[in-house]
Amino acid sequence: MNSTDKLDSHTPMMQQYLRLKAQHPEILLFYRMGDFYELFYDDAKRASQLLDISLTKRGASAGEPIPMAGVPHHAVENYLAKLVQLGESVALCEQIGDPATSKGPVERKVVRIVTPGTITDEALLQERQDNLLAAIWQDARGFGYATLDISSGRFRVAEPADIETMAAELQRTNPAELLYPETFEQMSLIEQRHGLRRRPLWEFEPETARQQLNLQFGTRDLTGFGVEQAHQALRAAGCLLQYVKDTQRTSLPHIRGITMERQQDGIIMDAATRRNLELTQNLSGGSENTLAAILDRSVTAMGSRMLKRWLHMPTRDIKVLNNRQQAIGSLQDLYSDLQPSLRQVGDLERILARLALRSARPRDLARMRHAFQQLPDIHALLKGVETPYVQQLLSQVGQFDELQDLLERAVVEAPPVLVRDGGVIAPGYNSELDEWRALADGATDYLDRLEIREREKLGLDTLKVGFNGVHGYYIQVSRGQSHLVPIHYVRRQTLKNAERYIIPELKEYEDKVLTSKGKALAIEKGLYEELFDLLLPHLGDLQQSAAALAELDVLANLAERAETLNYACPTISEQPGVRITEGRHPVVEQVLSEPFISNPLSLSPQRRMLIITGPNMGGKSTYMRQTALIVLMAHIGSYVPASKAVIGPVDRIFTRVGAADDLASGRSTFMVEMTETANILHNATENSLVLMDEIGRGTSTYDGLSLAWACAENLASRIKAMTLFATHYFELTTLPEKMEGVVNVHLDALEHGDTIAFMHSVQDGAASKSYGLAVAALAGVPREVIKRARQKLRELEAISSHTATGTVDATQMTLLNEETSPAVEALEALDPDSLSPRQALEWIYRLKNMV
């Protein structure tokens, strides 16, 4: 589109379009024309590709045909949902003038901008997931990061000190839209994300940010929020708030404060740990078989979102954890009575956000009324519970009898979707509205009587009175009887099998009906806006109630999970260490067809590191992950899958397990593994829980072994972290002889001929064999390949037994001689745990070619 400069050469309507488009050059403009939203020029081309809609041409303007695409106004939400999922933003431009009185084009203006991070419409949002808008800032002192959930008003800021912490924050919050300054240097950190928005530098000005935030919260300064000195975070928050005001074009009364999130308040997890533990997303990007999938049976969407926030930010505040544990304990006998009432409360949090933005639909108000009707039952059910924390939450749930009464009087039982459809305000609420409705209804009755009268008077049995949007009211007579109509019948429309007529009397009543309907609808819209004015003064109390109800839902849900899944209440101790009796993996035990074998775990200052050996598929990774998940669950206040657990102070959880090539960044598996390892060695403390699985496997035998040895030594002697160290390097099993606090444990298996039975039970001491060939046989590797491998194994073991030194078991073919076969090096570097059956088979053929 080259013609924006020469506006005069365009038609008046296109001039209007181009002026509006110039104000929103970067985003799609949906331009309302009658029953359609139209897009023109490049917008039309882009939308036709993204939405798979027809690209046509509309006449010509400035001598050029105009590319055009359009969507019907009644289906616009579906198209917006698709665009938002693709990370696009859309400006909605409506007709605000009256076509009947307009000279020239009807007046239009952009009434809202829909962006991925600022949506509140039910149709566009994922119900059980937070939808965050975020802004990021970086300077020499570090990062500033702000997030806002506009559908709840939750506004958070943080100041990650380094790029690893910033990456972990992005992974945790997973914003739908991210604002960044045009000078942002670390593009590699964000460039893979959807919904990126480059913003001018002035939007991040610290003074402007302070003014914006103080104005929003009605405060003099930000000291009360604890963010006055958070200079980087405030820059991000200021840009974010400005963007929301620009896109929403209305006040934001539900955003009432800002909270600083400090890493030290919770258990810190880096991006790799969050991914590996599969908290809310599995390694394939789906949501099945995750911790959230097992733990989340919340009956409200707002409760589900709160639980996921807890999982991603476990707290270290012992008082909070004890409160939650006691509440869960006291709700175990009540959850079955409480959950049905909570389910009826629905997603009050998001309804209130739409109320605050004055975009609530009639059905939102009906749902709010329904939520208010549940509150007396919830109060009655919980008032006898003696746990102080449950009473504290209950005291935050208000009783809104007046508002309930207002909505019961004002809104019909089952309102239509939109106010413009009419019929939202209940009869008897407003006398003027009732009068106009009676007029409209009376006129309708009159038309029924007119039809009967004319049919009988003229003796035309096919005569009927009808209405359509183009021609208004008409009298229809079949073609066969049309020659019998009297002369004062004026033909209005001819159809294939009928003729339509108008008579003066009908025209008069048409005007009366349309006038009374239009008047009734105008009054109804005014009364609907008035309802917002009556509800909004109570917004603060309503939001507090919604938050308390969401938390009661999470706690009742965790009480149900604890009872159903046989979880025990962990003891949160201030003594260092982790002791678990009969621990189980919360996800694996639910997907296994056979009973899960529970296992103990003991870590203490005298027993800091477990060297874990045993066969592939023996359960090493499961054992390690279940430990991390039990510790994490204990730190959200939940009961845990064990018969007993005592959890001491934990500041961070690190996992270095099963890396894959990071093709996007051009990093090999080994490079990914070493980067994660470096992060652990730099940041772990004696209170950290560290899971190290098969360190050093992506390089040659000696490199890998030396790295694994040095890492284990460093973690055990310098850092003194609580470490689970799984390895196939059996040389590492000699570490306990050389260092205090290091202990061998193994997972056992029984071999019989070519078959193997994994015991999945953890025993003290080192494993005696790796059982790699038995696992290959299980994976379906052909018998002749297994046979040849056994033969080769015996040869290699013979070589190994001549050259082996120290206490290394000859059967482990550690091959300390210099003349190592490439096949053996490849075998050593291979991690069978991470192979699919097909990959295992490919490797066997590759190894055969090497030998």
UniProtKB/Swiss-Prot annotation:
Pfam families: MutS_I, MutS_II, MutS_III, MutS_IV, MutS_V
HAMAP family: MutS
GO-annotated biological processes: mismatch repair
Entry GO CC: cytosol
Residues that hold ATP according to the record: 614-621
Name of this chain's protein: DNA mismatch repair protein MutS
Species of origin: Serratia proteamaculans (strain 568)
Keyword terms of this UniProt record: ATP-binding, DNA damage, DNA repair, DNA-binding, Nucleotide-binding
Signal peptide (residue range): none
SMART domains recorded: MUTSac (SM00534), MUTSd (SM00533)
